[in-house]
Amino acid sequence: VAKAARRSRKRFGGSLQKYFLLDVSWTEEPGRIPILTSASILASFWDIVADWERVRYADYLMELVSSLFPQPGAKTKAFAFLLAGLRSLSLGEPPVSVGRKTEAALLALGGWGPDLSACRKCGRPESRSFRFVVAEGRLSCEACAGRGGILLSLGAVRTWRALQASSPPTVGRIRIPESVLMELQSVIPKYLMWNFGVSFKSLGDIPAGEKP
């Protein structure tokens, strides 16, 4: 945001590093590059750099938000979900868990969240298992499901529902059992990719079956 900041790192200290929440001020004139005049640290997520997977997922979350919400202007709630994800990574939550939580929350926030309320055929809200049809973003219950779709337990569906209904203050408090996390890992990234058809550079060297 400011050419002066790059020439004056001593002036702004370590506040220009990644993984800090800043309070910044700048001056702006028509047709000219904005000039950063002050930057102070409000919160640090620097513990992220202690682990490479945390770094990759932190960069992925920032890339994800900018990709899903590219329009100019404030994106207050999307930014709050991003901060919640960075905070969880900094506190040591497994990166894969943070990734799935943030993906589900942001998809719902942007209006792309799937309809997980009930079976698409019979309307049954509960079943021992469901199949999720990625192309439709809907569920089929155990009785109605054919061979298509991705098999999900009721626990996985309930967890995904909770993530879609979460707020920035509550999403980090949702605990995902390992077995459920594996199920969500098999479906949420696929649904995200189906909706947007983009690859994310931050996780570019992960095997194709595991992205993002």
Pin down the residues of each PLM region.
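Non-catalytic alpha-helical scaffolds and adjoining flexible linkers that form interface surfaces
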Residues: 1-212
